[in-house]
């Protein structure tokens, strides 16, 4: 027992150093370790006060009880709650009913200390962990058995849940890859001494950047160097797709101490060795209303090169750079060392020498000379390789020809035996010899025709799927229509070829499914359609190739991902298709026309709203528009038709047309009486005829000379107004949208409140001013007609008298 006292005191002193306060229970435990906790807490309380005067002068028992878990048996001090610690106080009445015999002692034995920890843990388990997290919101999702996954993260996982990101992302938002976009929309001249089997089989396989000799870009405008803002000279392109002058990019890279620098446009890393030669060709940008020529294309299944049907050939390898007839339809162009030297390197050398001659005395000349040095090194490398291979070229060519001719000879030897015998029939006992050994030529021609004709059903299926882009009708109607008998047209299940129309200049512009269905109806199949068609562009819709689009448009599966293409709708005319075909698809064509008109109206309204919002930010508001077309609110003067032998009077004005006044001015109590001054009949007889013009005439008022001729003579009475009522004055205006756009579609716009309300008031005033007509039955009987009682329709501050 004397040995436990120093150890306990040492523990208490350590606690004083760490926590900055002493515990009275520690001193009581060291002096009276065998006494009950009640006497220990009451007796030696005074002994603990001098020890805690430094930092806690009040000596609160509650405070000291909070520091109790400093003993060795209480190892879970950081995990215990205030509730479990407060139960150790003598004033706490809500203690557990059964604590055990010696369990009331705080630190009597190791078993009791472990039991106290278990009780504290059991009490914490009864409550939610959210109640001990402070003033934060409580999450009760675990009670509802509900888990919320953020948008874009839900999806199907493979195996152990580590599937690819693209398959888990059901929303289809994929990260943008600059190199993928560049390789999908450009053409590459590559060295021919490499293997491109993977690129020829999969359109999404990226080309090795080290094998690229030149990049060809087809754009609607000539690019400019972002450094000098001029058309690039000896242009170079980076892996991120930005084009610079060779001297400008060398100047930019020389400013950095490192071997690479950030792209001035997109801040990607730019290395000197990654710069490739680039040629940008400008193509025509078609808009609505232009005339475009499309040609019929043919592509075999599994082949990534689509060629015109008139120029079609079996393509089993990338097209060479020298093939000008088919080079614009291939993504990869194979080039030999000699072709790279003459068609790439020498052209850059000529451009740099011309630039050096123009800017020889400028600070930029040193970078032009550096570019010329790079061209010289590349030229020597290509010349050395070309000279070393010149001797072997003839031998290699001869060997390749021998290798290619050997399989052809074997195939020609065994080919006549393929179509000699038919299969044995189940009901025949003998094998019939169908034909003798015929040459393969006549047999191959129907086979080719059959393969080409087979493509029609699947092409129709593709057009059905393509209609989702074109917003046309379902293509199932083609199967219900009457089939047109065409030679060589057969309905088979599979197809080895795809047929489609593409722009003649090689741009990725394809014919709309509505036009394709018209051609299929007219000619029976796309195979038998014209090789070229020319028509006016009606609509152009741009798209980007994705997995979803590729599944729905199988004839475009040769385009790589992120490749941009357009679907073009043409206005086909009777020279290409007949009037009967156009009438058959008139509903689809009219539906698409209404959709275009609706889209154009919505676009104009959107632009108008944006313009109004922008003007409001700048403090400019639209002007007030007062319609002057309403002749009731703004009356006009009709011209007098005066003659020399007739005077102004009630009888003459009825025949020749008099002053047409508004209903408000014809009323006896109207306030417009003082606005008009009547003319004298005598003055009108002696003076030449004059006219008071209306809105359509040049002079709506009296001239000064006419006023002098009239003088001061005035008529005693007013001329009787012609009882001519303009029925169109109160006619409702044409249906106009709230934005001022006329809507020719089925939608009926809401009428303007201002116009309808003012017209209703005018109609009410006219009913009040019009005298009641006498009843013919009452006039015959001689009885006095009873005066009709007027009905009040609208009350204003204006007083109308009868």
Swiss-Prot record:
Lineage, broadest ranks: Eukaryota, Metazoa, Chordata, Craniata, Vertebrata
Organism: Rattus norvegicus (Rat)
Identification of the protein by name: E3 ubiquitin-protein ligase RNF10
Composition bias type Basic and acidic residues, residue spans: 114-124, 716-728
Gene of this entry: Rnf10
The protein's role, per its UniProt record: E3 ubiquitin-protein ligase that catalyzes monoubiquitination of 40S ribosomal proteins RPS2/us5 and RPS3/us3 in response to ribosome stalling. Part of a ribosome quality control that takes place when ribosomes have stalled during translation initiation (iRQC): RNF10 acts by mediating monoubiquitination of RPS2/us5 and RPS3/us3, promoting their degradation by the proteasome. Also promotes ubiquitination of 40S ribosomal proteins in response to ribosome stalling during translation elongation. The action of RNF10 in iRQC is counteracted by USP10.
Biased composition range(s): Polar residues: 645-654, 793-802
Its EC number(s): 2.3.2.27
GO cellular component: cytoplasm; cytosolic ribosome; extrinsic component of postsynaptic density membrane; glutamatergic synapse; nucleus
The organism's place on the tree of life at top rank: Eukaryota
PROSITE patterns per UniProt: ZF_RING_1, ZF_RING_2
Chain intervals annotated as zinc finger (RING-type): 225-267
Region Disordered, annotated ranges: 1-134, 645-664, 716-753, 767-802
Family: Belongs to the RNF10 family.
Coiled-coil stretches: none
